[in-house]
Regions:
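Repetitive, compositionally biased segments used for assembly/scaffolding
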Residues: 1-161
């Protein structure tokens, strides 16, 4: 990856960064984005890539690797940057704060996207929304989720709200 960390931060990008400094892909639900973790055809979203956290045989995806979010004991999981801010980590380690479980990352992004974008849409187009339920689901997906927590603005970037 040719773009440096400082550039990504100044652009307010949302991405994963391995604890050894390797860029692990853009946090995006868009499967067409070239560096999206949702694009199964690229090196960041492929289950076969040596630098994908989705590859259970790579150092970034193996349950036995200290750099993997799937290691339930790791203290060095991938870091989550949302809109250029370091907000937490991607990890199965339940003892870490501000963590998102890698198995529900897409769901977390989808729910977050709905929560943040709803106020900007025309309300009459949507059914009644149970905000308490949405908040509880957010808490389940990210235990540290709060009303001031991190939520997705769109499929390509996030924002604190």
């Amino acid at each position: 990856d040719r773009i440096g960390l400082d550039t990504r931060i100044s652009r307010k990008e949302s991405f994963l960064l391995a604890n050894d400094g390797l860029y692990l892909g853009r946090l995006s639900l868009n499967t067409s984005t070239p560096d999206s973790i949702s694009n199964n055809e690229n090196i960041y979203g492929s289950h076969f890539s040596s630098i994908s956290f989705k590859n259970r045989y790579s150092i970034y995806g193996s349950p036995s690797s200290s750099l993997s979010p799937y290691n339930p004991n790791t203290l060095t999981p991938p870091v989550i940057y949302l809109r250029g801010e370091k907000i937490g980590c991607l990890s199965k380690n339940v003892n870490l704060t501000n963590r998102v479980d890698p198995d529900v990352l897409n769901e977390w992004m989808i729910i977050s996207d709905y929560l943040i974008s709803f106020p900007y849409r025309k309300i009459h187009k949507f059914p009644i929304v149970n905000w308490e339920l949405m908040y509880l689901v957010g808490q389940m997906l990210m235990p540290s989720f709060k009303t001031t927590g991190v939520i997705v603005v769109s499929d390509n970037f996030f924002r604190h709200h």
